[in-house]
Amino acid sequence: LDVWAHSVAALSHVPPEPTIRIAALLHDIGKPSCFTVDENRIGHCYGHAQIGAEIAEEILLRLKSDRATQTAVCDLIRFHDRLIEPNERSVRRALQLRGSAFFFDLMRLKRADNLAQAPEFRSRQTDYDVIEQMAHGILERADCLSLSDLAVNGDDLKGIGIPSGRTMGAVLRHLLEQVTDDHLPNEKNALLTYAASLPPDFAPPKTHE
């Protein structure tokens, strides 16, 4: 299928809700402007999701769409190609992007995108079932997904000598990542012991997710 036919097919697989239907129609609009062919004559559209989000924003601005719709549509397009694997770490990371409502809209778009491909490429639907089941379990358990869910806060960190400001913010975000990835339990003593072991000028390593 070409981009237009694929987009129309994806549109037929999403619910009749304006935000997700606009996102489905425009989700691959960035592909033509970033299409390249490699030495094996295989086509690629690297970066099309980000470019598509920027183009969609321009379109929605011209149409005088409200800001909430612009943000939701552009975020769905921006993240529609993000790999979400059927494991809890990956699902928690996806839930942290924009919250649970956005996550399930994103899954609807990803399902539609996959169903709009040729039959031999529609194999991800089973993975999506597992991913959504995991997400419901994570939400029902009230897993730690945000800084406010952490068992420690800024006052706790001050109590072990971590200064306010950039360092404290970096430590809190790092603790959240450690809990998200199951490297630490979300328990006050465990988090404070780990935080106390970090260097005074702690800065987390850069990630490329």
PLM segments and residue spans:
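Charged substrate- and nucleic-acid-binding regions of tRNA-handling and nucleotidyl-transfer enzymes
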Residues: 58-62, 115-209
